[in-house]
Amino acid sequence: MHAYTVEPLYVKSGQEVIAADFYRPKTEEKPAVIVMAHGLAGLRQFKLIQFAQRFAQAGYAVVLFDYRYWGGSTGRPRELVSIKKQLEDWRTMINHLKERKSIDSRRIVLWGTALSGGYVLDIAAEFKNVQAVMAQVPFVDGAESAKLYPLQQLPKALKLSSQDYMGGKVGMSPTTLPVVDPRELCFLPTQDAYLGYRSIINPDYYWSGEIPARLFFNLIRYRPIQNVRQINIPVLFIAAKHDSLIPIESSREAATNIAPFVQYHEWEMQHFDIYHASWFEKAISTQLEFLHQHIGVR
C-alpha cells in the first residue's frame, strides 16, 4: 500500500475556477493519473473520496474535481448543470494535466459515474491522448432513459425546462426542480433513486437538492452512445442490470459499439448500489485489476 498526500488544486476554466483534490503517491516519481468527477448534481464528497483513496493507495495519482457552479468551484447561478460546460471542464482538466510535470501525462485515465460516465465515453471518443476509461453505470442515451420517465409527468417537466431556459436568457432567477423526490416532480423520479441518492449525500457539505430545470431538455438530447464507435482505447464498462434510470439495453448496445476495446460487466444491482459495501468492493477491485492490466504502477 502506497502512502500519499492530498493537496488542493485550482484550475481556471473559462472565467471560473475549478476546485479539485490532487492525490499524489509519495513513492511514485511520475505516476499515472486518474481524473474523476461526479454524475448529476453530485459533489466530489458524495462517495467518490473512497474510490480516490483506494486508487492513491495503489500508486496512482488522482485528480477529483467539482464542476463549475458546484462545491468548491466558482460560478453562478450555483448548482447549475450544463452538459456543455461540464464537458468543457473535463477537457480543461485533461489539458492542464498534460502540462503538469509531477505526473506522467502519457498515462491519463478517465473515471466517470452515471452522467459523468457518459462524459468520459464522449471525451474518450474525442481525445487521442487519454490512455483508458472507466465508466460505472454510465448515462449513455438520454432519449432511451426518457422512456423510463413517468409519461404523465413528462409534459410538465419539459414545460418547466423550457421556461427556465428562456428565463436564463434574460437574466431571471432559475426555476428549479428537485434532483430526487418521493412524491413531487423531479429529475430522478424512481423510489430507488430517491433512497439511493439520499444514501450518497455527505451532510457536511451544502447541497440544496434542486437544480435549474433547463437541464431536463438537454439531458434527453444527450446521447454519448452516438460517438462511442470512435473509441479505440481500453474501456471498463460496469452496468447495473436493475438500473431504473439507465435501460440495460442501452448499456449493452453502447458496449457492443465500443467492442473490441471494452471490458463489459453487468451486475445484479441497482443504480446507486455501486457506492456501497460489497458492490463498492467489487467495483474497486475490478477497476484496480483493469488499471493493473492496462496502465500499471512503475
Model-derived features: where do they sit?
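Catalytic active-site module of serine/aspartate enzymes centered on a nucleophile-bearing elbow/loop
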Residues: 267-298
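Conserved alpha/beta-hydrolase "acid-adjacent" motif
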Residues: 244-250
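Short beta-strand/loop motif that positions the catalytic acidic residue
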Residues: 231, 237-239, 243
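N-terminal cap/lid segment of alpha/beta-hydrolase-fold proteins
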Residues: 1-29, 83, 277
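Alpha/beta-hydrolase-fold enzymes
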Residues: 121-201
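Catalytic nucleophile-loop/oxyanion-hole region of alpha/beta-hydrolase
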Residues: 14, 44, 70-105, 277-283
